[in-house]
C-alpha cells in the first residue's frame, strides 16, 4: 500500500530517529543462560510464530518459566501493541504484541519502542508493513537464500509519517478496518451467480 501525502502534512524520517529503543535478544538461547524451556509458562516469540500482521501462538511454541523470563528479558517487558519485526527467515514480518502477557523475545525477532511524541505503535506497524517499506527492506537485505537485515540496514530505512498523531490514528484505524474486511472475505468464500450455466459457484 502506498500512502498519499498530498492532503496532510507528512514528513520523511529515518526509522532509528523515531525509536527510543530496539529490544534485541537474537543471540540469546536457554542453553547460553544455562537454563531450559518449560512445558508451560511464558511463550517465546520468534520468526516462526510472528507472522505478517499477527502472532500465531500455536506454531513452534516454546515456553519459559518465571526464572528464565526474568533472566532473559530483564526489565524489557513487552507490552500490548508493541511492534515486533522479524529480521531473518522470514525477513520483514511485522506484528504487534497481542496482549500484556509476558512474552519472551526470541530468535530472529526484535521489538521497537517508539518515541510516542513522533509516532504511535499502531502507525509504526502500518508503515513498516506498507509495500514501499517492504520493498526497501528487500532491496537492502543481505544474505543468499535466507535474506536478513542488520541494524545498519534499519538505519537506512526512511518512513513517511504524518506529523499529526491524530492523523496517524486515523490512517491506522482505516488500514485495520480494510485488513479485517480482506481477512473476512478470505475466510468466508461467498456465493456468486454463474452466468454460464445459471447455477452458483464459490468465488
Identify the function of each model-found stretch.
Residues 16-19, 32-69, 112:
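DNA target-recognition patches
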Residues 46-47, 60-129:
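A short beta-sheet element
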Residues 87, 103-110, 142-167:
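A short glycine-rich beta-alpha junction/loop motif
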Residues 4-28, 165:
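Non-catalytic DNA-recognition/assembly elements of restriction-modification systems
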